[in-house]
Amino acid sequence: MDNRGHFSSNGNFPPQGYHRREQSQEGMRIGNHHGPFSSGNMRSIGGSAQNQQQRHWTNMLNGSNNVENSWVCFSGNTSLADDPNVLSNFSALAQQRVNHFDTIVQERDNRNASFLNGSAVGNNLNTSFSVFGNLRGGDQDHRVLSDHTGIYTGLGSTGQNAVGTGIRLAADVANGNFLEQRAPTAMGHNQSYSALNQSLAPTLLDQYNQALLDQYNQSSQMAQGRGYPAPNIAYGLQNAGFPAPQIAHRPNTQNADPQAMNMNNRLRDHTFQMPHTNAQVPMSSLPGLFNLSMNHGSGNQQFQMNQSSSGPAPQLPNLSESFQMAQGSSQVTMSSRPAHSNTSMNHSSRNQYNHVDQRPSRPAPHLPTLTKEEEAFLETPDFEQFGRQLYNYLLPGILPNGAADTFSDAPKHQLLKLAKTLKPMLYDYWRKTMQMQNRGANINIIQWIIDFNAKFAALNSSVAKASNSSDVLNQTLPTAAEVSDVAREDASTSQPSKSRSMYIRPAASLDNTLETLDENLDSSQSHAGPVPAASTKPKTPSFEKMIRYSGIKKRSTMDMDNFVRMLDEKINFSPEPSTSSDIASSVKGYMSQSFLHQQDDEAPDCTKNVHSESDLKQAEPQESDKQSDKELPSNE
């Protein structure tokens, strides 16, 4: 009869008793090393000799017999031939016990059982057990009910529950090896349980091993050939999932269970374990996880894989590899950083160890959250001008990232645009600076920048007027009103004005840094006429000076060092290769002086004064600004 119906109907998980026995087995292993261990989950046939049995196994494991690497399995060879309801190789009771207790011990009722000699003895109460069908010289186990103890579950090497037996031996009685009295039970024919008032034999397994080894020498040699422990017959448990060698010369093969006696084992088992001398391949039935360990060849070569179905797909780096062939152990190390890639492989007969160390590359910069109006404003010339001034104020001498841009209407003027990731960062930095300066007030930063550009342009225009020269910046600036109007129009439409197409030109004639751009605005604006020849030509007001006059204290509201470090880590400063050397030289000092300008065909006359007196008055700093400027320590 095919007894593979051990597991539940879905074929995936065993019944509850399976788990309880497995937990009990773990407990026994603890007890083997730390003394007797009791577990209420251990089950014998009668269910009443749990503690006794565990002490029995504990004593054995502390002795010379390593049960944890042994298979001791028992099977019967009789049948109830006159029972029309049962097949010829199993009794109904045995089949029920196999499925319920994970055993392959067959129980026979001597009233109906047939033996090797074809005779039947006993009566209804003479229930006995067969261990491979016979003991010592082919004699059948004919002892009566009173000579038997229970058959116990639990043997450590299979990962499941093997069976023990408790047949009373004369040597045990004479030597006083019986432990405490218990009342195990054994099944009789057509009976659920019947009591047995007998003791347990602690040395039973050793004596059985010797008897079976003598009787089945050939089978024992087969066991050694397959790597099984030599002291025990290599007979695989059906529920353990590992192969068992053929044992067919002594038992009654005509009536023996072919499913348990040959190499064909259960197909739906979930474990596969072998002794430590062979390869161990533990696999979990969970769909997303598995561990695989294989022993192959004389040199121990291990591959351990941990796979999770919930994790993301691996990102494979595109790297150059260097291979080193060497004898002995070696390591394979991989990194996703292009500058530190080292791969070494070993193709020797020794141990091979593979290690993969993958570090993520630089994270993408965290861009602030902006409104649509703010995003549109970042693309206008107003913010381009202010962003360049602010960038150079924070990082003087470092050009922002971007490709060279060639304007169709002015091919000689090329400039580096602010990167798209740099604009939001600069805007957010200045927005936070203004909020901190004004104690969290919600300020219209867009309007502030537009007004700032207009005021800055008016101040530069007043300096040019005072010096009676428009060549201060080598360009003519529009009025403050024009700057504000164009910037507001661009911000509202997010498109450059068609009538006033603005762009930024580099101040090629200026070679000034932030440190040399400071001036005394009071003295420069007090001159209404041409500057005397003996006087020094006034300098252009610096962005830093304008910031201070706007009420922002230098490096007093934000941690500049952290912001600079953030820019350095998250922005890749690498201009396009097409940027020529003359452009690089022309932008020297350019970050501090970039202004809006009209197209060449709309440029006003450079000799005319395009600024009104009201513009100049509006551009002049107030008394409060002058006073606050005097209070600030100069760190120029």
Swiss-Prot record:
<feature type="region of interest" description="Disordered">
    <location>
        <begin position="1"/>
        <end position="54"/>
    </location>
</feature>
<feature type="modified residue" description="Phosphoserine; by mbk-2">
    <location>
        <position position="574"/>
    </location>
</feature>
<comment type="subunit">
    <text>Interacts with pptr-1, pptr-2 and pgl-1.</text>
</comment>
<dbReference type="GO" id="GO:0036093">
    <property type="term" value="P:germ cell proliferation"/>
</dbReference>
<keyword id="KW-0217">Developmental protein</keyword>
<dbReference type="GO" id="GO:0043186">
    <property type="term" value="C:P granule"/>
</dbReference>
<keyword id="KW-0597">Phosphoprotein</keyword>
<dbReference type="GO" id="GO:0048609">
    <property type="term" value="P:multicellular organismal reproductive process"/>
</dbReference>
<feature type="region of interest" description="Disordered">
    <location>
        <begin position="521"/>
        <end position="542"/>
    </location>
</feature>
<dbReference type="GO" id="GO:1903864">
    <property type="term" value="P:P granule disassembly"/>
</dbReference>
<feature type="compositionally biased region" description="Polar residues">
    <location>
        <begin position="38"/>
        <end position="54"/>
    </location>
</feature>
<dbReference type="GO" id="GO:0022414">
    <property type="term" value="P:reproductive process"/>
</dbReference>
<feature type="compositionally biased region" description="Polar residues">
    <location>
        <begin position="292"/>
        <end position="355"/>
    </location>
</feature>
<comment type="function">
    <text>P granule component, which acts redundantly with P granule component meg-2 to promote P granule segregation during embryogenesis, and germ cell proliferation and differentiation in larval stages. In its phosphorylated form, and together with meg-2, promotes the disassembly of zygotic P granules in the anterior cytoplasm of pre-gastrulation embryos. In its dephosphorylated form, and together with meg-2, promotes the assembly and accumulation of zygotic P granules in the posterior cytoplasm of pre-gastrulation embryos.</text>
</comment>
<protein>
    <recommendedName>
        <fullName>Protein meg-1</fullName>
    </recommendedName>
</protein>
<feature type="region of interest" description="Disordered">
    <location>
        <begin position="591"/>
        <end position="636"/>
    </location>
</feature>
<feature type="compositionally biased region" description="Polar residues">
    <location>
        <begin position="1"/>
        <end position="13"/>
    </location>
</feature>
<feature type="region of interest" description="Disordered">
    <location>
        <begin position="289"/>
        <end position="367"/>
    </location>
</feature>
<feature type="region of interest" description="Disordered">
    <location>
        <begin position="484"/>
        <end position="504"/>
    </location>
</feature>
<feature type="compositionally biased region" description="Basic and acidic residues">
    <location>
        <begin position="608"/>
        <end position="636"/>
    </location>
</feature>
